[in-house]
Curated annotation (Swiss-Prot):
It is found in: Secreted. This is Complement factor H-related protein 5. Disulfide bonds join C23-C72, C55-C83, C87-C129, C114-C140, C147-C189, C175-C201, C208-C251, C237-C262, C269-C311, C297-C322, C331-C370, C359-C381, C389-C431, C417-C442, C449-C492, C478-C503, C507-C558, C541-C568. The lineage of its organism: Eukaryota, Metazoa, Chordata, Craniata, Vertebrata. It comes from Homo sapiens. Keywords: Disease variant, Disulfide bond, Glycoprotein, Hemolytic uremic syndrome, Repeat, Secreted, Signal, Sushi. PANTHER family: COMPLEMENT FACTOR H-RELATED, COMPLEMENT FACTOR H-RELATED PROTEIN 5. Involved in complement regulation. The dimerized forms have avidity for tissue-bound complement fragments and efficiently compete with the physiological complement inhibitor CFH.
């Protein structure tokens, strides 16, 4: 009985003493082990045992390697096996973020700045990458806002009259007692209030002299010596310059409204996009801003669209389409109140056919062309009233945009921020449906970055500059066989670059080590002497050697320049 008790006690002590030398079988949420089916998931693992694991789609290990090595130690698994959610960050419509286009990991927090009149869900300012994805969708949605009831000078009338005005509402002005309006004829309600300023009414107004000279630009029409109140002139910039601010100025009671500026455009366009079933005359980039190139379609193909594309601010305008002539669609005439001057044979028209027509209650004639099944312009007798937007608003912290000129639907105005302020994405406002849409914000920018950090065995894809404005990004690449770990781009934030990537060393298959361990490449025709980090190389024993019981796996994973070679005896 005493002997039996001693045996049980010794056995119990041995078990207790061995608890610290065993690891629980690794259970990895959103991950799996290499050759997982070969292991017993209910067994414990002895110290020194090595496993490799990978993560499911949209998840990654902290090292960001495809296969990550973990080792059972007396303290447990090292490193701790886990898979982190990857959250891709889109380009934010109606807002911006320095993280646009980047990948973030679970636990990261990102700041989003929405345009005026827009906000994140629940008015959040930051969103976090969590296991399910983004904590809040990275979408800037329209938010309701209000403007005060305007207090106007005597003899100024505003319509429509309401008890409250919402963001987007437009007020139109007129003068009583046959007085003359001085200032804008309409204003719009924005998140920051009414803009532009309200007008006044006067009995007499002064004329203006010739419009002022514009540096690197000129007036489009012939200049006069005198311009009447409310007369408008329009400017164009010289080649390689783009206009910022309202391109039209107006004579207002003897003074011209604010001039635009012409800014030299240094962004160039690269190779011309390939046109399916078409061609361009070959030439070598870069192409300067404003340069146009003619494109052509092959024989038996018809062009749909403009035959010229232009480099605008580093981007080519839209390519036309080349459609096979036998695939071109016909156009039809619809509408009982349309009278055409043609005998409508079957009421169908071939591509490029032109018609002249008039409507029942309108005497003047209209013209249209059939373009691949669609009339251009549309054959229509509905009277559409031309819509105008109020003068463009004075955006907070933007350069002076004071003007009293209305803009037609589709017209754009480029915005330029004051010094120390940055316009991260949208640089133009667009007049649409009689209102200015999606106003950008000028964000304070107190610090610039120097050249991007250098990395071992890698370089940037572009020539480094001496200074970079906040929000700038630079892309890296590694030398051949080196694997890039981390984000391929770095971003300038608060005078500092985000963490650059690393170029992980490749592995070189060593003949000396293979001979020493009595092994050879499993696939003799593989000829694989180099392997990137995360790549696998398979070995086998040389005849007549056999695998050692404690040998590492014969499918070796390259880990930052090192293989763990299997052993045969």
């Amino acid at each position: 009985m005493l002997l039996l008790f001693s045996v049980i006690l010794i056995s119990w002590v041995s078990t207790v003493g061995g608890e610290g030398t065993l690891c629980d079988f690794p259970k990895i949420h959103h991950g799996f082990l290499y050759d997982e089916e070969d292991y017993n998931p209910f067994s414990q693992v002895p110290t020194g045992e090595v496993f490799y694991y990978s993560c499911e789609y949209n998840f990654v290990s902290p090292s960001k390697s495809f296969w990550t090595r973990i080792t059972c130690t007396e303290e447990g698994w090292s490193p701790t096996p886990k898979c982190l959610r990857m959250c891709s960050f889109p380009f934010v419509k109606n807002g911006h973020s320095e993280s646009s286009g980047l990948i973030h990991l679970e636990g990261d927090t990102v700041q989003i700045i929405c345009n005026t009149g827009y906000s994140l869900q629940n008015n959040e300012k930051n969103i976090s990458c969590v296991e399910r994805g983004w904590s809040t969708p990275p979408i800037c949605s329209f938010t309701k806002g209000e403007c005060h009831v305007p207090i106007l000078e005597a003899n100024v009338d505003a319509q429509p009259k309401k008890e409250s005005y919402k963001v987007g509402d437009v007020l139109k002005f007129s003068c009583r007692k046959n007085l003359i309006r001085v200032g804008s004829d309409s204003v719009q309600c924005y998140q920051f209030g009414w803009s532009p300023n309200f007008p006044t009414c006067k009995g007499q107004v002064r004329s203006c002299g010739p419009p002022p000279q514009l540096s690197n630009g000129e007036v489009k029409e012939i200049r006069k010596e005198e311009y009447g109140h409310n007369e408008v002139v329009e400017y164009d910039c010289n080649p390689n310059f783009i206009i910022n601010g309202p391109k039209k100025i107006q004579c207002v009671d003897g003074e011209w409204t604010t001039l635009p500026t012409c800014v030299e455009q240094v962004k160039t366009c690269g190779y011309i996009p390939e046109l399916e079933y078409g061609y361009v005359q070959p030439s070598v980039p870069p192409y300067q801003h404003g340069v146009s190139v003619e494109v052509n379609c092959r024989n038996e193909y018809a062009m749909i669209g403009n035959n010229m594309i232009t480099c605008i601010n580093g981007i080519w305008t839209e390519l036309p389409m080349c459609v096979a002539t036998h695939q071109l669609k016909r156009c039809k005439i619809a509408g009982v109140n349309i009278k055409t001057l043609l005998k409508l044979s079957g009421k169908e028209f071939n591509h490029n056919s032109r018609i002249r027509y008039r409507c029942s209650d309108i005497f003047r004639y209209r013209h249209s062309v059939c373009i691949n099944g669609k009339w251009n312009p549309e054959v229509d007798c509905t009277e559409k009233r031309e819509q105008f937007c109020p003068p463009p608003p004075q955006i907070p912290n933007a350069q002076n945009m004071t003007t009293t000129v209305n803009y037609q639907d589709g017209e754009k105005v480029a915005v330029l921020c004051k010094e120390n302020y940055l316009l991260p994405e949208a640089k133009e406002i667009v007049c649409k449906d009689g209102r200015w849409q999606s106003l950008p914000r000028c964000v304070e920018s107190t610090a610039y970055c120097g050249p991007p950090p250098s990395i071992n065995n890698g370089d940037t894809t572009s020539f480094p500059l001496s200074v970079y404005p906040p929000g700038s990004t630079v892309t890296y690449r590694c030398q051949s066989f080196y694997k890039l770990q981390g984000s391929v781009t770095v971003t300038c934030r608060n005078k500092q670059w985000s963490e650059p990537p690393r170029c992980l060393d490749p592995c070189v298959v060593s003949e000396e080590n293979m001979n020493k361990n009595n092994i050879q490449l499993k696939w003799r025709n593989d000829g694989k002497l180099y392997a990137k980090t995360g790549d696998a190389v398979e070995f086998q024993c040389k005849f007549p050697h056999k695998a050692m019981i404690s040998s590492p796996p014969f499918r070796a994973i390259c880990q930052e320049g090192k293989f763990e070679y299997p052993i045969c005896e």
